[in-house]
Amino acid sequence: MAESEENSVLFPIFILTMMAIPLVPYTFVKLSRAFSKKQRSIHCQCLECDRSGKYKRSISQSISSFTSCSNLTVVLLWIVMIFLIYHTKNMSRESQLFEPFGILGLEPGASDSEIKKAYRRLSIQYHPDKNPDPEANKYFVESIAKAYQALTDPLSRENFEKYGHPDGRQGYTMGIALPQFILNMNGESGGILLLCTVGLCILLPLVIASIYLWRSSKYTGNHVKLQTRQAYFELLQPSLTPSKVMDIFIRAAEYAEISVRKSDDESLQKLFMSVKSELNLDPKKLKQEEAKFWKKHPATIKTELLIQKQLTRESSVLSPTLQRDFRHVLEFAPRLLEDLIKMAVIPRNEQGRGWLRPALGVMELSQCIVQAVPLSARKSSSEDIAPFLQLPHFNESIAKSIALQVKSFQKFQELSLAERSKLLREVVSLSETDVQDIEKVLEMIPSLKINVTCKTEGEEGIQEGDIMTVQAWITLKRPNGLIGAIPHSPYFPFHKEENFWVLLADSNHVWFFQKVKFMDEAGAIAAASNTITETMEPLGASVKETNDAVKEAVEKVKSGSRLVMGRLLAPGEGTYNLTCFCLSDTWIGCDQKTSLKVEVLKRTRDVEGENAEEGLEEEDDEIEEEDYESEYSEDEEDKKRGSKKKVNKESSSEESGSDEE
C-alpha cells in the first residue's frame, strides 16, 4: 500500500508532461500567427476601406474571436496545467536527500552541544510523549531521531559520511506513474495497464491518423475538394471565353453544400430580376434562356446570383440568411479561383502546354470579384471603364466621364496631382475629401515591370531537346513606396492579399507558369539565394562569383523585385514568339506583358558527340586489328623462318653427303 501511494504521486507529473508536449508548441504557433496578423496591417487608408470595418474589430467581434472553441480549449488546458504545477510543487517528493543538519535546524559543522540542544528542543515539539499526532510521531522517528543518531553515533556518522544515510547504503525503487485506485486493484492492475497501453499508445493514434487521412484525402493542398478540382479539369476548354468562366467557377463542390431553403425562393426571384442583365442571357431567346437558368441545381443558382450581387455592389439588400450564404460564397472564392487557374494552365497536350485563354478569363473574374466590378464593364468598348470603377467614389457615369477626358486609366495615373485634382473637381464635381481618397488608392496601385530570358545553361544557343531555363525578374513599384500591401477592396468582406501570376505563353499555349507574392520578403530572399546558388554551382562558378550573384539578387528582392525561374523542354526547331504575362488577381488595369523571341536550333550537340565517339571506336578497332594481325604474322614468319632453316639444313646435309662420296 505504501509503495503504491509513493508511486501514485508521480501520476500528476505524468499527466502534466503529456499535456505540455502538445500544448506548449500549439500555443506558441497560435501566438506567432496572431502576432503576424497584427504585423500585416499595411492596408488602404481610404474612407471606404475604413467604413467597410474588416480592418477594425469591434469589442463583440474581438470577444467572439477570442472565445472560439480552440482558444477556450487552450485556456482551459493551461488552467489545468497551472493547477498540476502547483500541486506537484507542494506535494512531498518521492525521494529526498537526507540532511541531518537541516532536519535539526543547524548549520553544517555544528558542535555536539548545539546538536544535543537542538534535539532536545525538537523532542519537546515532536516526541510521541509530548505530541500524540501520528504525523509528528512519524516525523520524529524517521527524521529527527535518525538525524540525531547520524550526528552523534560513530557508526551512524560513518555510514552517513560514506552513503549519505545513517542506515548505510540505500536502494532505490522504480514506480509507475498511475493513479492509486489502479495500483490498489488486486490481480487486475495488469489488465488495466494493458488496456491503457493499447488504447492510448496504439488505438488512439490510429483513430486520429485515420480521421486525418480520411479528411485530407478529400482535399488538395490548397484546401479545395478533389471533387471540385476534377470538375474544373473536365469542364475547362481551350477556347473558353471569359464570359463563360463563371459557369465553371460556380460548379465547385464547396458551393453545392450551400443550404437551399424554401423561404429564399422569393428573394432569389428578386435577385434574378435585379441582375438579369449581367447573366449573359441571349436576348433573342430570353424565355428559353431563363427556363434553362432555373433548371440548374438550386445551390448553383444561388451561388451565381450572390456573386452577381457582389459584382454589382448590391449585397446590402440581402436578407440575413442570404448574407450568411453570401459570405460563405466569397470566403471560398479566392482559393477556388486559384485552383481554377491551375487547372487552366496545367499541362494537357504532349508538349506539356496549358491553355492561356481560360487562364486570362479566370484572372478577369478574380479581379472583378475582389473589386466588385461587373463583368460587363470588362467587355470591349470605346471606353475601358473597369479600372476606374475600382477607385473610391466612382460609379459608371463618373467613370465614363473621366474616360472620355483621359482616354485610358494609365494616362489618368500619369497626370500630375494638380491636374488630376482639377479634373475630378471640375468634370465630375467630387469634393476635396473624395479626391484625397482617390489619391490614396492610386498610390496603392502597383506598376509592374518584366525582364525575362530563356536560355540553355552553359550553352551558346538553344537546341531542340535542350532543358531551357526561364528566368524572369518581376519588379513592383508603388507611388507610396510600399512593396507588399493589402489591396484596396472595400466591397470584399475578407482580408485578401494580392497575388501575381507569371505566364509564358505562345498563342493559346502556356509553356510556364508560377505564382508570385510580394508580402513575404524574407521568403523571397531565401528562395532567390537558393535558386541562384543551385544554378551557378553546376556550371563551375567560383565561390566569389556565386556570392556576388546572390548578393545582387538579394538587393533586387529588397528593392521590390521577385525572381521567377523554371525549366522546360525545348520544342522542335523553329522561331517562337512568346509573350510573358504578369497578371494580378486583385487589381484591374495593372497587368503587364512583354514579348520574348526564342530561336530553337537543330540538334547538333549529340550528333557531334556521337561522331566523335564513333571515330574513337574506329581507331580502337584499327589498333586492335593491327594487334591481332601482328600476333599471327609473327607466328607465320616464325614458321617460314623454321622451314627455311630446315631446307637449308637438308641442302647442307646433301652437299656434305656428296662430298663424302
Curated annotation (Swiss-Prot):
Function of the protein: Required for integral membrane and secreted preprotein translocation across the endoplasmic reticulum membrane.
Segments of this protein annotated with the region Disordered: 608-661
A Pfam family that the UniProt record links to this protein: Sec63
Glycosylation sites: N90
Disruption phenotype: No visible phenotype under normal growth conditions.
SUPFAM superfamilies per UniProt: Chaperone J-domain (SSF46565), E set domains (SSF81296), Sec63 N-terminal domain-like (SSF158702)
Entry comment describing in which tissues the protein is expressed: Expressed in leaves, flower buds and flowers.
CDD domains recorded: DnaJ
Binding partners and assembly: Interacts with OEP61/TPR7.
Transmembrane segments: 9-29, 66-86, 191-211
SEC63 domain ranges (all copies): 206-597
Cytoplasmic compartment residues: 30-65, 212-661
Source taxon at top rank: Eukaryota
Composition skew (Acidic residues), residue ranges: 609-637
Domain J: start-end pairs: 99-164
Membrane-protein topology: Multi-pass membrane protein
Reported induction: By tunicamycin.
GO cellular component, one term: cytosol
Keywords: Chaperone, Endoplasmic reticulum, Glycoprotein, Membrane, Protein transport, Transmembrane, Transmembrane helix, Transport
InterPro entries in the cross-refs: C2_domain_sf, DnaJ_domain, Ig_E-set, J_dom_sf, Sec63-dom
Main subcellular location of this protein, as a coarse class: endoplasmic reticulum
Lumenal side: 1-8, 87-190
Gene source species: Arabidopsis thaliana (Mouse-ear cress)
GO biological process: protein transport
Name the UniProt record assigns to this protein: DnaJ protein ERDJ2B
Localization per Swiss-Prot or TrEMBL: Endoplasmic reticulum membrane
